């Protein structure tokens, strides 16, 4: 199903190193030609200092017998450069060890003063630490790189020319080492920096677009990610605007998060509005499944789209782990919507809508009623399911109103900020003529 594969477009917004897991994942699928994929990986890895990975990829392409001398020499050069950078950072190595062991001081200024007093710390050392962190990252030594990147974050001023690069590098390294808790902290820190920085409109849009793509990797691997992705992508106007303007394909991941998050069903109404608005720029089986079910009430169409959704998710690196959960929750959505309309239905009819056998459907419904505490009854003799009324709980109503008010407040705050900037700019321009 290459027509629905987003790897090519997603990789445009990811760091080179973050693309490798996606490309290796595709190698295990039969979407693209294996030879072409490996050649693309080789071309990409050649732009890094991961020489062993380059050699391994050449072996997979049956090019190991013709290992070029310059590659062997390049490995030697990389090791020599790494040694040189480590020597430059040697005076503050003990300080980074302290940070590794979690003994860092909370106050950045106090820590810098201690460095200057105990380790004769100079500005040149910070530049060396930054270069070493970047070089370690390029070599694929992400774990060690995070130590120096953390050191840079503690010591650097947010006004430093390399501060933003360090934020991005730290997030990438934590993602690649699968440290999801720390990655979420770094993601939040980077988002706050981008939202408060004095970027131009275009620069801010570009930064947010990149952050959106990187954050998908974090959100679908962190326990709290399913709530956070909805809050950030759907209820933060600046990020929703970035999705609608630059990357509507991200709707796939937002829609998936809403489907598998039973506690955020209140977000469905807002999601459907956005899907309808963006349907002319982006559609896939996941967004079409929701349209069929909640806009057109086309249950046959929803059933067919759910089958396509399984293939799409199975071949998408970001959400493949959600496959079983998605199918289960999508069936629940079909069940709830169908019963809400018809109130009394036959089990055989419901089994057809859910792509299940009648006896499987009956067991599924029994477990659903028991576990989810749905107000429904099964008449086994007649083969009927009778739904009771499902009033919206006060808690759900409150959450829905809070989300709506939060979104409107952020939108108004954004308008006020833009008008204020425009007014200040006009005021500044008027002084040019005096």
Curated annotation (Swiss-Prot):
GO BP annotations listed: formation of cytoplasmic translation initiation complex
Entry's family note: Belongs to the eIF-3 subunit E family.
Primary role: Component of the eukaryotic translation initiation factor 3 (eIF-3) complex, which is involved in protein synthesis of a specialized repertoire of mRNAs and, together with other initiation factors, stimulates binding of mRNA and methionyl-tRNAi to the 40S ribosome. The eIF-3 complex specifically targets and initiates translation of a subset of mRNAs involved in cell proliferation.
PROSITE patterns: PCI
Assembly mode: Component of the eukaryotic translation initiation factor 3 (eIF-3) complex. The eIF-3 complex interacts with pix. Interacts with mxt.
GO cellular component: eukaryotic 43S preinitiation complex; eukaryotic 48S preinitiation complex; eukaryotic translation initiation factor 3 complex, eIF3e; intracellular membrane-bounded organelle
Protein name as annotated: Eukaryotic translation initiation factor 3 subunit E
GO terms, molecular function: translation initiation factor activity
Subcellular location: Cytoplasm
InterPro entries according to UniProt: eIF3e, eIF3e_N, PCI_dom, WH_DNA-bd_sf
Assigned keywords, A-Z: Cytoplasm, Initiation factor, Protein biosynthesis
Stored Pfam families: eIF3_N (PF09440), PCI (PF01399)
